[in-house]
Regions:
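Histidine-acidic metal/acid-base catalytic patches
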Residues: 1-153
Length: 153
């Protein structure tokens, strides 16, 4: 995406970030989303999850790494993604041995997790984050996020 500025028409260049593909490349999906958003090049995003650098698993969003999923939802919400017609795709597939009648549960689960994480982002205390940054108390910030995700007061 960065090299798109050197093309004849940079406005025609954009990307579709898929969480699992970023993970497969050893990257953090939230950082990749943030980079694309900063360049105004995120055309769509496909959220899913991945257990390390195996084959492309297309697991339900957030089932392997809840914190990583939270960070993705947070960066999308902070940047108003979706307010101008953009959409979030759920690029997931049913597990190989899933019964036909359960073949949509992975989509339902992904959507439930996404909405639950949106609610967590809405509760995020940015003033506390700023205080932690100013005091360089990143352990407190890390624990705050974990407590938020776990529902611990």
């Amino acid at each position: 995406m960065a090299i798109s500025a050197a093309t004849i028409d940079p406005s025609r260049v954009g990307g579709n970030l898929e969480s699992a593909h970023a993970i497969l490349a050893g990257l953090d999906p939230a950082h990749e989303i943030g980079f694309a958003l900063a360049m105004n090049k995120l055309m769509t995003v496909h959220l899913n999850d991945q257990n390390s650098i195996r084959y492309d698993q297309d697991k339900a969003f957030g089932v392997e790494n809840l914190r990583q999923a939270f960070n993705q939802v947070k960066v999308l919400k902070e940047n108003g993604y979706g307010e101008h017609g953009e959409y979030v795709g759920l690029d997931v597939k049913a597990m190989r041995t899933t019964k036909d009648e359960d073949s949509y549960k992975h989509l339902e689960n992904s959507l439930k997790i996404f909405k639950a994480l949106e609610a967590k982002v809405d509760k995020f205390d940015y003033d506390f984050q700023q205080k932690c940054v100013e005091e360089r108390d990143f352990e407190a910030l890390e624990m705050y996020v974990m407590n938020l995700l776990m529902g611990v007061e």
